[in-house]
Amino acid sequence: MRNKAVLDLHLVSDSTCETVIAVARSAVEHFKSLEVNEFVWSLVGSKRQVDKVMLNINPERHNLIMYTVVDDDLRKYLKEKATAQSVRCIPVLAHVIREISCYLQVTKDPNAHPHKLGDEYFNRIDAINYTISHDDGQNLWDIDQADIIIVGVSRTSKSPTSIYLAYRGYRVVNIPLVCSVQLPVDPATIADKLVVGLTIDADRLIQIRRNRLISMKHQENCNYVSYEQVVEEISEMKKICAKNRWPTIDVTQKSVEEIAATIIQFFNRKNNRTGDALY
Protein backbone atom coordinates (compact mmCIF):
# COMPACT_ATOMS: atom_id res chain seq x y z
CA MET A 1 0.00 0.00 0.00
CA ARG A 2 1.38 3.37 -1.04
CA ASN A 3 2.09 5.88 1.73
CA LYS A 4 -0.01 9.02 1.77
CA ALA A 5 1.54 12.24 0.51
CA VAL A 6 1.95 14.71 3.36
CA LEU A 7 1.26 18.42 2.94
CA ASP A 8 1.85 21.24 5.42
CA LEU A 9 -0.99 23.63 4.59
CA HIS A 10 -0.51 27.16 5.92
CA LEU A 11 -3.71 29.23 5.97
CA VAL A 12 -2.99 32.94 6.26
CA SER A 13 -5.39 35.85 6.67
CA ASP A 14 -5.33 39.42 7.89
CA SER A 15 -8.73 38.67 9.42
CA THR A 16 -10.39 35.64 11.06
CA CYS A 17 -9.24 33.00 8.53
CA GLU A 18 -12.80 31.71 8.13
CA THR A 19 -12.88 32.11 4.36
CA VAL A 20 -9.53 30.54 3.63
CA ILE A 21 -10.21 27.67 6.05
CA ALA A 22 -13.53 26.89 4.37
CA VAL A 23 -12.03 26.97 0.86
CA ALA A 24 -8.95 24.97 1.84
CA ARG A 25 -10.89 22.23 3.60
CA SER A 26 -13.32 21.93 0.72
CA ALA A 27 -10.40 21.60 -1.69
CA VAL A 28 -8.45 18.95 0.24
CA GLU A 29 -11.61 16.85 0.56
CA HIS A 30 -11.00 15.94 -3.08
CA PHE A 31 -7.70 14.24 -2.22
CA LYS A 32 -8.36 11.23 -0.02
CA SER A 33 -4.77 10.03 -0.45
CA LEU A 34 -3.43 13.26 1.02
CA GLU A 35 -2.46 13.73 4.66
CA VAL A 36 -2.72 17.40 5.61
CA ASN A 37 -1.14 19.21 8.53
CA GLU A 38 -3.10 22.43 8.89
CA PHE A 39 -1.54 25.61 10.29
CA VAL A 40 -3.88 28.56 10.82
CA TRP A 41 -2.41 32.07 10.88
CA SER A 42 -5.15 34.63 11.55
CA LEU A 43 -4.98 38.41 12.04
CA VAL A 44 -1.70 38.67 10.13
CA GLY A 45 -1.54 42.42 9.66
CA SER A 46 2.15 43.32 9.48
CA LYS A 47 5.35 42.30 7.74
CA ARG A 48 6.74 41.15 11.07
CA GLN A 49 3.85 38.72 11.41
CA VAL A 50 4.42 37.48 7.87
CA ASP A 51 8.06 36.86 8.79
CA LYS A 52 6.90 34.80 11.77
CA VAL A 53 4.72 32.67 9.50
CA MET A 54 7.60 32.05 7.11
CA LEU A 55 9.97 31.13 9.94
CA ASN A 56 7.58 28.36 10.94
CA ILE A 57 7.63 26.74 7.51
CA ASN A 58 9.80 23.64 7.39
CA PRO A 59 11.76 23.68 4.09
CA GLU A 60 12.22 19.91 4.29
CA ARG A 61 8.51 19.31 3.84
CA HIS A 62 5.89 19.88 1.14
CA ASN A 63 4.38 23.29 1.92
CA LEU A 64 1.52 25.30 0.50
CA ILE A 65 0.24 28.72 1.54
CA MET A 66 -3.38 29.67 0.92
CA TYR A 67 -4.30 33.20 1.89
CA THR A 68 -6.75 36.09 1.95
CA VAL A 69 -4.96 39.39 2.52
CA VAL A 70 -6.64 42.68 1.63
CA ASP A 71 -3.69 45.07 1.92
CA ASP A 72 -1.81 45.19 -1.41
CA ASP A 73 1.62 45.84 0.12
CA LEU A 74 1.27 43.06 2.67
CA ARG A 75 0.01 40.65 0.06
CA LYS A 76 2.97 41.47 -2.19
CA TYR A 77 5.36 41.00 0.74
CA LEU A 78 3.87 37.59 1.56
CA LYS A 79 4.24 36.44 -2.05
CA GLU A 80 7.84 37.67 -2.20
CA LYS A 81 8.75 35.83 0.99
CA ALA A 82 7.04 32.67 -0.21
CA THR A 83 8.83 32.82 -3.56
CA ALA A 84 12.18 33.31 -1.81
CA GLN A 85 11.57 30.09 0.13
CA SER A 86 10.19 28.25 -2.93
CA VAL A 87 6.77 27.88 -1.32
CA ARG A 88 3.69 27.87 -3.54
CA CYS A 89 1.32 30.68 -2.54
CA ILE A 90 -2.37 30.66 -3.58
CA PRO A 91 -4.76 33.63 -3.15
CA VAL A 92 -8.14 31.96 -2.66
CA LEU A 93 -10.32 34.92 -3.69
CA ALA A 94 -8.21 36.57 -6.39
CA HIS A 95 -9.76 34.67 -9.31
CA VAL A 96 -13.33 35.29 -8.14
CA ILE A 97 -12.69 39.00 -7.55
CA ARG A 98 -11.05 39.31 -10.96
CA GLU A 99 -13.95 37.56 -12.71
CA ILE A 100 -16.53 39.85 -11.05
CA SER A 101 -14.46 42.90 -11.92
CA CYS A 102 -14.07 41.90 -15.57
CA TYR A 103 -17.69 40.85 -16.00
CA LEU A 104 -19.19 44.04 -14.55
CA GLN A 105 -16.36 46.37 -15.58
CA VAL A 106 -15.97 47.64 -12.02
CA THR A 107 -12.92 47.88 -9.81
CA LYS A 108 -12.74 46.39 -6.36
CA ASP A 109 -13.00 48.66 -3.33
CA PRO A 110 -9.45 49.35 -2.09
CA ASN A 111 -10.81 49.89 1.43
CA ALA A 112 -12.71 46.62 1.60
CA HIS A 113 -11.94 44.59 4.68
CA PRO A 114 -14.14 41.51 5.06
CA HIS A 115 -14.90 40.12 8.52
CA LYS A 116 -13.83 43.17 10.48
CA LEU A 117 -14.52 42.88 14.19
CA GLY A 118 -17.58 45.07 13.87
CA ASP A 119 -21.28 44.62 14.53
CA GLU A 120 -21.52 41.32 12.68
CA TYR A 121 -18.79 39.76 14.84
CA PHE A 122 -20.40 40.86 18.10
CA ASN A 123 -23.85 39.84 16.85
CA ARG A 124 -22.49 36.36 16.29
CA ILE A 125 -20.96 36.24 19.77
CA ASP A 126 -24.33 37.33 21.14
CA ALA A 127 -26.04 34.57 19.15
CA ILE A 128 -23.65 31.96 20.53
CA ASN A 129 -24.16 33.14 24.11
CA TYR A 130 -27.93 33.20 23.67
CA THR A 131 -28.00 29.73 22.15
CA ILE A 132 -25.82 28.18 24.86
CA SER A 133 -27.99 29.66 27.61
CA HIS A 134 -31.13 28.30 25.90
CA ASP A 135 -29.86 24.77 25.33
CA ASP A 136 -32.11 21.87 26.31
CA GLY A 137 -35.15 24.02 27.07
CA GLN A 138 -33.49 26.40 29.50
CA ASN A 139 -34.46 30.05 30.12
CA LEU A 140 -37.58 30.06 27.97
CA TRP A 141 -38.73 33.36 29.46
CA ASP A 142 -37.16 35.28 26.55
CA ILE A 143 -37.88 32.79 23.79
CA ASP A 144 -39.36 35.69 21.82
CA GLN A 145 -35.76 36.80 21.13
CA ALA A 146 -34.98 33.59 19.22
CA ASP A 147 -34.60 33.43 15.45
CA ILE A 148 -35.08 29.67 15.31
CA ILE A 149 -36.58 27.10 17.68
CA ILE A 150 -35.64 23.44 17.35
CA VAL A 151 -37.72 20.67 18.94
CA GLY A 152 -37.19 16.93 19.07
CA VAL A 153 -36.79 13.88 21.26
CA SER A 154 -33.54 13.16 23.06
CA ARG A 155 -30.40 12.50 20.97
CA THR A 156 -31.56 13.93 17.64
CA SER A 157 -28.68 16.42 17.25
CA LYS A 158 -30.61 19.41 18.59
CA SER A 159 -27.72 20.89 20.58
CA PRO A 160 -24.92 20.55 17.99
CA THR A 161 -27.22 21.87 15.28
CA SER A 162 -28.15 24.83 17.48
CA ILE A 163 -24.51 25.67 18.15
CA TYR A 164 -23.65 25.36 14.46
CA LEU A 165 -26.47 27.78 13.59
CA ALA A 166 -25.38 30.14 16.37
CA TYR A 167 -21.92 30.25 14.86
CA ARG A 168 -23.61 31.41 11.67
CA GLY A 169 -25.31 34.23 13.58
CA TYR A 170 -28.70 32.75 14.46
CA ARG A 171 -30.15 32.90 17.96
CA VAL A 172 -31.47 29.40 18.61
CA VAL A 173 -33.55 27.75 21.32
CA ASN A 174 -33.75 23.96 21.41
CA ILE A 175 -36.48 22.19 23.36
CA PRO A 176 -36.54 18.48 24.19
CA LEU A 177 -39.89 16.76 23.67
CA VAL A 178 -40.55 14.23 26.41
CA CYS A 179 -43.32 11.68 26.04
CA SER A 180 -46.38 12.40 28.22
CA VAL A 181 -44.88 15.73 29.30
CA GLN A 182 -46.57 18.92 28.13
CA LEU A 183 -44.63 21.20 25.81
CA PRO A 184 -42.97 23.77 28.10
CA VAL A 185 -44.07 26.69 25.94
CA ASP A 186 -47.45 27.65 24.52
CA PRO A 187 -47.27 27.18 20.72
CA ALA A 188 -49.46 30.27 20.29
CA THR A 189 -46.71 32.46 21.78
CA ILE A 190 -44.19 31.32 19.15
CA ALA A 191 -46.50 31.28 16.15
CA ASP A 192 -44.39 33.91 14.38
CA LYS A 193 -41.15 31.96 14.90
CA LEU A 194 -39.58 29.29 12.75
CA VAL A 195 -40.01 26.07 14.74
CA VAL A 196 -38.41 22.95 13.25
CA GLY A 197 -38.84 19.40 14.48
CA LEU A 198 -36.02 16.88 14.19
CA THR A 199 -37.06 13.27 13.69
CA ILE A 200 -35.05 10.09 13.19
CA ASP A 201 -35.37 6.39 12.40
CA ALA A 202 -36.23 4.48 15.58
CA ASP A 203 -33.53 1.82 15.15
CA ARG A 204 -30.87 4.46 14.60
CA LEU A 205 -32.04 6.43 17.64
CA ILE A 206 -31.90 3.31 19.82
CA GLN A 207 -28.33 2.69 18.66
CA ILE A 208 -27.31 6.27 19.48
CA ARG A 209 -28.99 6.15 22.88
CA ARG A 210 -27.49 2.78 23.74
CA ASN A 211 -24.00 4.11 22.97
CA ARG A 212 -24.77 7.14 25.12
CA LEU A 213 -25.80 4.94 28.07
CA ILE A 214 -22.65 2.85 27.73
CA SER A 215 -20.45 5.96 27.75
CA MET A 216 -22.26 7.23 30.85
CA LYS A 217 -22.32 3.79 32.54
CA HIS A 218 -26.12 3.94 32.91
CA GLN A 219 -27.03 0.80 30.98
CA GLU A 220 -29.83 -0.07 33.41
CA ASN A 221 -32.09 2.63 31.89
CA CYS A 222 -34.14 0.22 29.78
CA ASN A 223 -37.01 2.55 28.85
CA TYR A 224 -34.59 4.97 27.20
CA VAL A 225 -33.71 2.32 24.60
CA SER A 226 -37.01 0.44 24.53
CA TYR A 227 -38.24 0.09 20.96
CA GLU A 228 -41.86 0.71 21.95
CA GLN A 229 -40.90 3.77 24.00
CA VAL A 230 -38.75 5.24 21.22
CA VAL A 231 -41.42 4.69 18.57
CA GLU A 232 -44.00 6.35 20.82
CA GLU A 233 -41.70 9.35 21.43
CA ILE A 234 -41.07 9.85 17.72
CA SER A 235 -44.76 9.43 16.88
CA GLU A 236 -45.78 11.95 19.55
CA MET A 237 -43.18 14.44 18.29
CA LYS A 238 -44.51 14.14 14.72
CA LYS A 239 -48.07 14.69 15.93
CA ILE A 240 -47.07 17.86 17.79
CA CYS A 241 -45.27 19.21 14.72
CA ALA A 242 -48.16 18.32 12.40
CA LYS A 243 -50.70 19.92 14.74
CA ASN A 244 -48.72 23.17 14.84
CA ARG A 245 -47.69 22.98 11.17
CA TRP A 246 -44.01 22.95 12.03
CA PRO A 247 -41.68 21.54 9.35
CA THR A 248 -39.70 18.44 10.25
CA ILE A 249 -36.33 17.09 9.14
CA ASP A 250 -35.38 13.42 9.18
CA VAL A 251 -31.82 13.51 10.55
CA THR A 252 -31.16 9.76 10.25
CA GLN A 253 -28.62 10.07 7.46
CA LYS A 254 -27.79 13.77 7.78
CA SER A 255 -24.76 15.55 9.19
CA VAL A 256 -25.15 18.58 11.45
CA GLU A 257 -24.11 20.78 8.52
CA GLU A 258 -26.85 19.33 6.31
CA ILE A 259 -29.47 19.71 9.04
CA ALA A 260 -28.44 23.33 9.60
CA ALA A 261 -28.47 24.09 5.86
CA THR A 262 -32.04 22.81 5.59
CA ILE A 263 -33.12 24.87 8.61
CA ILE A 264 -31.53 27.97 7.06
CA GLN A 265 -33.53 27.33 3.89
CA PHE A 266 -36.72 27.17 5.98
CA PHE A 267 -35.71 30.39 7.73
CA ASN A 268 -35.02 32.21 4.47
CA ARG A 269 -38.31 31.06 2.99
CA LYS A 270 -40.27 32.15 6.05
CA ASN A 271 -38.60 35.55 6.10
CA ASN A 272 -38.45 36.04 2.32
CA ARG A 273 -34.67 36.08 2.41
CA THR A 274 -32.37 34.93 -0.37
CA GLY A 275 -29.07 34.79 1.53
CA ASP A 276 -28.07 31.97 3.85
CA ALA A 277 -26.91 33.86 6.91
CA LEU A 278 -27.93 36.76 9.09
CA TYR A 279 -24.77 38.60 8.22
UniProtKB/Swiss-Prot annotation:
It comes from Anaplasma marginale (strain St. Maries). HAMAP family: PDRP. ADP binds at G152, V153, S154, R155, T156, S157, K158, S159. This is Putative pyruvate, phosphate dikinase regulatory protein. The keyword Methyltransferase does not apply. Bifunctional serine/threonine kinase and phosphorylase involved in the regulation of the pyruvate, phosphate dikinase (PPDK) by catalyzing its phosphorylation/dephosphorylation. Pfam families: Kinase-PPPase (PF03618). Belongs to the pyruvate, phosphate/water dikinase regulatory protein family. PDRP subfamily. GO terms for molecular function: ADP binding; ATP binding; phosphotransferase activity, phosphate group as acceptor; protein serine/threonine kinase activity. Keywords: Kinase, Nucleotide-binding, Serine/threonine-protein kinase, Transferase. Its EC number is 2.7.11.32, 2.7.4.27. It catalyses: N(tele)-phospho-L-histidyl/L-threonyl-[pyruvate, phosphate dikinase] + ADP = N(tele)-phospho-L-histidyl/O-phospho-L-threonyl-[pyruvate, phosphate dikinase] + AMP + H(+); N(tele)-phospho-L-histidyl/O-phospho-L-threonyl-[pyruvate, phosphate dikinase] + phosphate + H(+) = N(tele)-phospho-L-histidyl/L-threonyl-[pyruvate, phosphate dikinase] + diphosphate. It comes from the Bacteria.
